[in-house]
Amino acid sequence: MKRDEKILCLGDNSSNDAWAHTLTKKIAEENESIFRGQINDVNQDIVAGYYHVDLVTLSEREILSIIQKFDDVVLLDQSIDKYSHAHVFTSTWKFIKHLKQAGHHVHVINSKNMDFLDYWDDLLKKNKSFCLYPWVKSVSYDDHHTLCTQSMTPVTKLSDMKNWKDDPGYTVVRNKMLKGQKIPNCTACYDQEAVGENVSIRRHETIEWAALLHLKSINELKDITSPSYFELRFSNKCNITCRSCSGHFSHLIQKENDQIKDEKFQTIVDKQAFSSTGGDELIQWDNIKRVYVGGGESTVQPELYRFMRKCISNNNTDFEFRIGTNGVRISDKLFDLFKHFKNLTFSLSIDGTPKVDEYIRWGTEANDKYSNMQRLKNQGHPIALNFVMSIWNISHIGEILQYFDKAYPGSPVHMNKAGYNGDIISPFLFPDKDVVKESIAKAKKTQVYFSNEQRTKFLIDSVDKFYSSDKSVDFEKLKKFFYYNDTLDRVRGVALKDYIPELERCRKFVT
């Protein structure tokens, strides 16, 4: 690198010791150049010298814009302990892969720090079954254990974790995965990857947990004796009735479905029952890295209060704690408890702009949701948005992402396709293609689209590809959707035309 060149260094500078800042300055001095400091503005004028950007504070889109102004790019390949979080470490690794694939030259200093992620990436490409979850995660329902929430079929039954490592059910799954044999419980990830999706839960979480646990190879799995990740779902008690959900995760939906005396409707809805669960007594605190509490709606469940008070009284508050919530009702008592957890983050379920969100997630009050999220942010708790893409919101996906940019700036968006009744509420069923294409064009100009969440970008691109093709929607499924949706509207006393008129106008395609 020459003295008169413009050099950009990439690193995580959010840790207390400002490691990236210090190292960039050192490299500039070694190359007899000038250290110009950190870039915080994409419009900043650039002259010869060494600059660095913080991989935490700037989005992928912003960094890509900045890179165009430089002669060379240097990755400050920090060891994982120098990153603010393992997620930033893995996101950086993915970003560098994208840069190289796009033709950017990236000069890497001491690349061995990230080489082990290449190992796991290669393994996942060769072994289409392998996933780290059976070695790191516990999801329990009344002593029944599942592999993850994408698969509710139990693999074993355990009343405590003493035999977790050698449990026959887990052992069968682990051995099959090591041999590359497909697992019946894991079809959700297989289906995603079958259409070219390389950001399935299997792929994403394996890379993430390899980083979190500093696993260098598959040979180290034999040393894992207890799970590091516990997912707790105390009950299906909930305070709203989401159209893309089922009675399994909302007792109100379960109650509503039971009251609808319509044989055709009953053949459509998911009837899987929720078993009451605890699970927190199984946690092995010596090894814990992450706990996720979902529902139902976590904030209306007394077990969440009990669990948090138990953690506080036992001084177990430093783990990575995630709570899934619809954000509608959060009590002052909960806000007081939240203050004790410094690594607490929230996953907010939100499916549209306020009016659309209130229709899809029936019982939601958008103003209360927004106020509660601002209060959480003021407490210093990061918020991620959990968005379910469906026929209800695909026609104005652009407006929705613009709203997210404005109302929740900087919050990552975890985008998923509908799971329950997914075939009849699919985002690929909207028959007026021009409406969707126009909205997709808006979506591709948002910060959300250019964020570091690969899954979000992939899903938007896949929808764009479908609606730009000559493929037709499945009108039989569309007809079934209107029947399903009309039944819910009739029970709830609302009308689709008052909330999503462009979808109501599509009724003409099936009548």
What are the language-model segments listed below?
Residues 116-235, 241-264, 485-511:
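Flexible mid-to-C-terminal extensions adjoining Fe-S/redox cofactors in radical SAM and related proteins
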Residues 32-44:
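A short beta-strand-loop structural module common to alpha/beta enzyme folds
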